[in-house]
């Protein structure tokens, strides 16, 4: 039987791609959106695999957050529904890039072409979120 792909599998795959390009200074506006999306998938893996809703309403909330593209909303769910505290260094890094998924992909009032500064912010958030996620997974697996 073939192994089911998880949010972590997709996050790790894009992490390698993102970091290769970052390390080789291949910067493009899509890197900002990809950085946010990688962070989303790391956090969504924790929710998908470890959140245990006890009611239909809680199950609906879980499904809704797994479709969200707001890092703040995803972090709030982890704090409120799963009692997982995200270190301020990690949450602050994600707050900086929250919104890049849309503002760097589509034209509009808040859209912009991401530059090196935003790509560096995205890389920082990705690294911190990855480290946090792998640590949380390890802790949850030990329970």
Regions found by a protein language model. Give the residues of each.
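Terminal alpha-helical segments
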Residues: 1-143
């Amino acid at each position: 039987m073939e192994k089911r792909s998880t949010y972590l599998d997709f996050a790790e795959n894009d992490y390698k791609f993102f970091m290769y390009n970052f390390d080789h200074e291949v910067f493009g506006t899509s890197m900002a959106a990809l950085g946010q999306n990688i962070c989303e998938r790391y956090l969504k893996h924790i929710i998908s695999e470890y959140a245990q809703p006890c009611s239909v309403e809680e199950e609906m909330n879980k499904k809704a957050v797994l479709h969200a593209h707001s890092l703040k909303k995803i972090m709030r769910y982890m704090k409120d529904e799963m009692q997982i505290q995200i270190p301020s260094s990690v949450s602050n890094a994600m707050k900086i890039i929250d919104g890049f998924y849309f503002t760097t992909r589509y034209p509009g009032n808040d859209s912009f072409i991401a530059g090196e500064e935003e790509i560096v912010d995205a890389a920082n958030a990705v690294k911190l979120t990855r480290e946090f996620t792998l640590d949380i997974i390890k802790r949850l697996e030990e329970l």
